[in-house]
Amino acid sequence: MDAVEIHDAGGPYAAKGFFYRDMKMDSLVPSDIVAWDESGISDKVLDSFEKTVQYCKKNNIELVCVTSPITPTTSVNGYSEQAGAYFTRLCEEYGVEYYDFNLLTMDTLPRTDDDFFDEEGHMLGELADRYSDILASVLLDKCDKSTAFYGTYAQLEQAVYENYVTK
């Protein structure tokens, strides 16, 4: 099956759980963004993460954790910084590499809220293709990570402000 059209999916099913969304909406599909609360992470989830880390280390499998980008506006107005800090600490504690792709510079991955289907970060197909290329280059160590990512959310917020508010 090459593609299946699913009503309300925003585009055809391409494969492996990927809908190639190309539908431009008048506005983002609203989402119920939940406040970040690290106390809401269950012991069961942490136990599963620890078992995954142990399995990968025992079997010489490189485990890399990532947070994929969400809309620029939501990433600076929501809880991304708190979540990113939590996952950074968690991954450092277990010796696992972690990348917060919300912090990709706007030069590395130009994006606006219009490149997304909803506030949760479901990308339209064109952005998903560009992000996949960048993700691969980071994982394959084929890019300069020191210039591909902002160092802080304050730098991201400044770039979002410069790109959206002042233009």
Regions found by a protein language model. Give the residues of each.
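Second-shell loop/turn segments in exported
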Residues: 35-42, 72-77, 117-122
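Active-site segments of SGNH/GDSL-like serine hydrolases
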Residues: 52-77
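Short amphipathic alpha-helical segments, especially helix-boundary/capping motifs
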Residues: 25-29, 61-64, 108-112
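Secreted/periplasmic serine-hydrolase-like ester/acetyl group-modifying domain
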Residues: 1-59, 147-167
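C-terminal regions of proteins
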Residues: 77-167
